[in-house]
Amino acid sequence: VSEKGEVYVWGLNACAGAGNLRDELLTNVKSASQPRKILGITDVVKVDVGYVAMIFLTSKGEVYTCYTGFDGYAGANADASASTALQKHAVFSSGTGASDVATGRCHFVASTIAGKVYTWGCPNALGRTYGDNHEPTLLSADMSREFVVSVSAGEYFTLMLTRDGTIYGTGDSNSGQLGTQIAGSKFKTPIRLASSPPRVLAVTAGYQHAAAIARNV
């Protein structure tokens, strides 16, 4: 992200690209290695890169997503040229500005300035069994009393940090990434991570692991 809020990518990423860009990136490493500006978006303050997609947050709290054009899409049935187009999500443009964003293997998550959380994409890590998986949908009952300040996304799981330093998670915990000790466990609704350190300041999710920064007690 540049000082002007412009985003540059390189490697196998055809986000906001057109026509035969995908084929060129696959066959020409010189072209793939060159930084390319993503057209159609500025004023970006945060970008997160997942396995198949990118998500952007602007200073106004707007949220955009696009797919890289490689290895599939987040639960969507679309061809590469359509899916690599930049998409603005209107739910974050009318008094519901986002404060943080993340993308995992094939899902998206965003927290708002009001402390709420929206998820969409592949159903494994959305923390809900209702709503449209292809559109940002509010996590309602299970997180209604919590104020979430940041989010992070792993392969098929999501982590949410509240302002009192509590970590919640949802999705796969087959490798203990949600703090559970039961092999193969999955959670369709958010759970509190009982094994997390106290007074957490920040949390991040990786492929099948997680890390946190805790305040000195």
Predicted features by range, described:
Residues 1-217:
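Eukaryote-biased RCC1-like beta-propeller repeat architecture
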